[in-house]
């Protein structure tokens, strides 16, 4: 079942929001890492910024694929983060 045409530009806009979020996360992490002592004490927490940035990027790419008209199953199969793919796949499975 195709989406209503208004969904496609919304997906594109949401993808851009996710990219902006990634950019802001990366900037925040970089500013926190300027203090070497802080970065050393909080290295595991700072790694979470990278994980969140990757998740935001994958979300943006997924939304781009959907806005381009790719079928949701195909778009989901291209997600590179396994846990994210599994969670979204479970949600998609509930719809069919």
Q: What residue ranges belong to the model's regions?
A:
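Sequence/structural signature of long amphipathic alpha-helices
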Residues: 1-96
């Amino acid at each position: 079942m195709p989406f209503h045409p208004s969904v496609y530009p919304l997906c594109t806009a949401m993808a851009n929001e996710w990219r902006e979020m990634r950019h802001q996360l990366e900037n925040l992490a970089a500013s926190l890492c300027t203090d070497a002592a802080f970065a050393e004490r909080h290295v595991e927490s700072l790694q979470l910024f990278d994980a969140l940035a990757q998740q935001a990027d994958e979300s943006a790419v997924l939304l781009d694929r959907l806005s381009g008209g790719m079928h949701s199953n195909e778009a989901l199969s291209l997600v590179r983060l396994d846990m994210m793919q599994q969670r979204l796949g479970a949600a998609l499975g509930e719809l069919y």
